[in-house]
């Protein structure tokens, strides 16, 4: 790491943090100087793999020693609020893994704490940074299909996510909190903020506690309507994991992002088909490479914004609007009613 690079500290050396560590090695202008985990085995594993000398079993000790410009919090949700508040107390800019908080009130408090401390806070919400998602957004912004009035954001899979992350089978909440949060964020990113939401959930797999299927209807503030549908109980001939498929209808044409990263755009001048595939980074492996590339993209974005002083695309304040959609989806599924998002924020 050269002297001008921003130095980061990573807290939490679990399943997904390895992707973050790989990406930090590729980020221009930043790198990881210290790591922290309560599990000595994981600490040693990640420390040895990435050659990190400074290792801590306790976050308080890490912050007390200091010597870093930002912290990347990659722990599970239970510790997020305490760690974000610790970062704010030490005036250290923070990235926080999703789900951001245990509740919307916790999330609001964390955003407020960082605003009061005058430090940037970004939620590691990487799906909107995937190459195919950015490609859809670029087409829409070019005006090629006119004004969008309808959309569908779909993630249906039979992939076994439980072997790598067994805790996913244990929670009362599953697919909306773990995956739907990303799909809802994509819907916001592409079609704008949401006025009202209606949701239905189902549990198909009898071996898990939470819901593994969700269908969510969104009324966007700009008048567009969209459907977010997610499932881990869908058995297909060709497994699409971890692809998000997108349909957008506009006043002048349509966008279709289909399986295999095929991007079809139909407008007044006819149809074009292109390949929106992500890059396979040197450390990435299929089929995860789509997500792995977006980890690098969001961490580069954080580094650029931290250097220039601008707000990040998925700042804590912005992410409250996605987090509210998750809470609203559970509320709507429980009581069968449509939820007003504005009233929650």
UniProtKB/Swiss-Prot annotation:
Q: Where does Mg(2+) bind?
A: 24-25, 27, 30
Highest taxon listed in the record's lineage? Bacteria
Q: Which residues cross the membrane?
A: none
Enzyme Commission (EC) number: 1.1.1.420
Residues given in the record as NAD(+) binding sites:
15-16, 37, 79, 97-98, 126, 165-167
GO MF terms, alphabetically ordered: metal ion binding; nucleotide binding; oxidoreductase activity
Tell me the pathway: Carbohydrate metabolism
The entry's substrate-binding residues are 98, 165, 178, 182, 232
EC category: oxidoreductase
The entry's keywords: Carbohydrate metabolism, Magnesium, Metal-binding, NAD, Nucleotide-binding, Oxidoreductase
Q: Which Gene3D superfamilies match?
A: Dihydrodipicolinate Reductase, domain 2, NAD(P)-binding Rossmann-like Domain
Family classification: Belongs to the Gfo/Idh/MocA family.
Name of the protein this chain belongs to = D-apiose dehydrogenase
The species is Rhizobium rhizogenes (strain K84 / ATCC BAA-868)
